[in-house]
Amino acid sequence: MSKLVQAISDAVQAQQNQDWAKLGTSIVGIVENGVGILGKLFGF
């Protein structure tokens, strides 16, 4: 869960700094961590 929070924090910070490459990778991190959490919930 902390990785998801960190990825969201990185995305917000990248947007504020207008660092579009970092924003893109942060969004990918959010998706990865979200899928991982859902996988654990549903036993994947």
UniProtKB/Swiss-Prot annotation:
Record keywords: Antibiotic, Antimicrobial, Cytolysis, Formylation, Hemolysis, Secreted, Toxin, Virulence
Keyword Disulfide bond appears in the UniProt entry: no
Record bears the keyword Secreted: yes
Matching InterPro entries: PSMbeta (IPR008846)
Stated role: Has hemolytic activity and also inhibits the growth of gonococci.
Provenance organism: Staphylococcus haemolyticus
Protein family (similarity comment): Belongs to the staphylococcal hemolytic protein family.
One Gene Ontology MF term: toxin activity
Highest taxon in the source lineage: Bacteria
Record protein name field: Antibacterial protein 3
Record Pfam families: PSMbeta
Modified residues (N-formylmethionine): M1
Location within or outside the cell: Secreted
GO cellular component: extracellular region
GO process terms (BP): defense response to bacterium; killing of cells of another organism
